[in-house]
Regions:
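Vicinal oxygen chelate
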Residues: 2-7, 10-19, 47-51, 70-158, ...
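Core segments of cupin and vicinal oxygen chelate
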Residues: 6, 16-64
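Short beta-strand/turn micro-motifs at beta-sheet edges
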Residues: 1-4, 67-72
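Alpha-helical elements of the RecA-like P-loop NTPase motor core of helicases
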Residues: 25-26, 93, 128-129
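Short, flexible, mixed-charge acidic loops at enzyme active sites
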Residues: 63, 71-74, 143-145
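Hydrophobic pocket/interface hotspot
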Residues: 24, 28, 82, 99
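A short, acidic/glycine-rich surface segment
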Residues: 64-70, 106, 138
Length: 158
């Protein structure tokens, strides 16, 4: 069946497991200003972290989260990373600075087609990409590197 355009309106949520629910909530609240919603203290403890209107992380606490994820990767899939888009360049810079302060990010910012992007990790080691659309008249207040997608050769230097 071929349907065009894709009949999906948005990503509603991404489900994650963590061995420390409170630590993960603190990280997303502090770094991204995310709102923690609908805490449930039963077994397993869980909550939603609101990222944008209609998009959230659904996080479940599981003491053996890393071990269980590795053991069941082929049963339930895995995730390499997810990307969050900053609304404004100033927000991108502020989040980058907080990630640097927490030592959760490579300080490298990439100049990719149409966006500036960086990669960081959350307290459980999940890779997060943060990007901001390139805008006329705004230049990042730090050096950037040209982004080279995996599998493509880097262009020769000057």
């Amino acid at each position: 069946m071929s349907v065009s355009p894709l009949p999906i309106t948005a990503v509603n949520h991404i489900a994650l497991t963590t061995p420390d629910l409170d630590r993960l909530a603190d990280f997303y609240e502090r770094v991204f200003g995310a709102e923690v919603l609908a805490r449930a203290e039963g077994e397993p403890r869980k909550f939603f972290i609101k990222l944008t209107a209609g998009t959230s992380l659904h996080v479940f606490e599981r003491a053996d989260a890393a071990k269980a994820a590795a053991a069941s990767a082929f049963d339930c899939g895995s995730i390499n990373h997810f990307a969050l888009e900053a609304r404004e360049p100033e927000t991108f810079v502020a989040i980058r600075n907080e990630l640097i302060a927490q030592r959760r990010v490579s300080e490298t910012v990439y100049d990719a087609p149409g966006v500036y992007t960086l990669f960081a990790t959350d307290p459980d080691g999940l890779l997060i990409e943060l990007l901001v659309p390139q805008r006329s008249g705004w230049t990042p207040p730090f050096a950037t590197e040209q982004f080279v997608p995996l599998g493509e050769p880097a262009s020769p230097g000057p």
